[in-house]
Design a protein with these regions (language model features):
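Solvent-exposed serine/threonine-rich low-complexity stretches and specific carbohydrate-binding patches
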Residues: 76-96, 132-137, 180
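Short amphipathic, basic-aromatic surface patches that mediate peripheral association
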Residues: 17-56
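Extended acidic/polar, glycine-enriched regions
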Residues: 95-162
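Short coil-to-beta strand junction motifs in C2/discoidin
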Residues: 52-63, 186
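Fold-level signature of zinc-dependent metallopeptidase catalytic domains
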Residues: 140-201, 211-221
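Active-site-proximal segments of metallohydrolase catalytic domains
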Residues: 206-282
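Catalytic Zn2+-binding segment of zinc metalloproteases
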Residues: 303-315
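Short pre-active-site segment immediately N-terminal to the catalytic Zn-binding motif
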Residues: 182-183, 278-302
Length: 315
């Protein structure tokens, strides 16, 4: 280990919890091919997960990434997940057009040089390596500037230290600065809805719920099929992949920058709209509209996709 790396790690240890490292990258391709390109390495706040639960044993997700010590090959962290690209490449557009999607991997900052391996599930169920990257925790190119000052984090419900709890982050999109009171009320209402439903009701004390204020210039989000276009703070939009009720955030970097102000493992984006809609992608995020009569059902339903990789009942 270099002297610089040793100094960095000693300073981190003296400061307390291990920081979170985020790898931002671009996933490009079509139905026939794909490629990965590094965008940035970003240092976030303290890692919210428990150090004894760093390895994902669920075997869920279309993709999996592993962090291994570069010298010994020891597995330090792993996580299965799904992605927007993984859904898009099954569409008819992907048969004729190539597109690019911004994605991120988050994990505790390694104590020494490490290798990150991203794999995709093959037809036989096994994982095959698609991309790898070597990282150095002392790399001066790592962005240590911190979260944007405009993102304000507040506590909806705290039942313990982040490392000992499941940390859920709620982010509102399409709420103006004058609608922050509504956003706070919506976040609290949805939290109560989640914990009124089993099995979350029985495990309420195992969760922390955080929220972040990200004001938009206009109220509401884009609904292209209705002729409504908004440049909301997170750029959430209905009509994802041509499905009118499917709500996604395609600007991953904007979303991750806002979320970086909070400790989180799971995230649900609440859009300030009355139209039925939502979505849930395993270990990425979930979305829901705030003011539809089906919002309570959709909120819990989409969180199930995101949190546990649950399939739809009709599949």
């Amino acid at each position: 280990m270099s002297l610089l790396a040793l100094v960095v790690l000693q300073a981190a240890a003296a400061a307390g919890p291990v920081p979170t490292l985020r790898i931002d990258y671009v996933h490009t391709g079509s139905a026939e091919h794909e490629a990965y390109s590094l965008d940035a390495l970003v240092l976030e706040g303290p890692w919210p997960g428990h150090p004894d639960r760093a390895i994902d044993g669920s075997n869920l997700g279309r993709y999996r990434f592993e962090v291994k010590d570069a010298a010994s090959g020891k597995l330090l962290y792993s996580r299965g997940f799904a992605s927007v690209f993984g859904e898009w490449e099954t569409t008819s557009e992907a048969k004729t057009t190539a597109r690019a999607f911004h994605e991120s991997l988050r994990f505790p900052l390694p104590g020494a040089k490490a290798k990150v391996v991203l794999s995709e599930r093959a037809a036989d169920g096994s994982f095959r390596e698609s991309w790898s990257l070597e990282i150095d925790p002392a790399d001066p190119a790592i962005d240590r500037s911190g979260p944007p000052a405009s993102a304000k984090v507040w506590t909806v419900e705290r039942n313990g230290e982040p490392r000992d709890k499941v940390d859920l982050l709620l982010i509102g999109d399409g709420y103006t600065a004058g609608e922050m009171a509504k956003w706070h009320a919506d976040a609290k209402r949805l939290t109560e809805i989640l914990f009124a439903s089993s099995p979350f009701k029985e495990r309420r004390k195992d969760f922390n719920v955080w929220a972040v204020d990200v004001p938009s210039d206009e109220s509401g989000v884009a609904r292209p099929s209705d002729g409504v276009f908004r440049k909301s703070a997170l750029r959430a939009t209905y009509d994802a992949f041509g499905s009118e009720r499917y709500v996604l955030v395609f600007d991953n970097k904007r979303l991750r920058e806002a979320a970086s102000a909070a400790p989180y493992e799971f995230m649900e984006v609440v859009v300030n709209d009355r139209k039925y809609g939502g979505g849930g992608i395993h270990n990425l995020y979930a979305t829901v509209s705030a003011d539809n009569r089906f919002t309570p059902y959709v909120f819990v339903h989409e969180f199930g996709h995101h949190f546990a990789g649950l399939a739809d009942e009709y599949y």
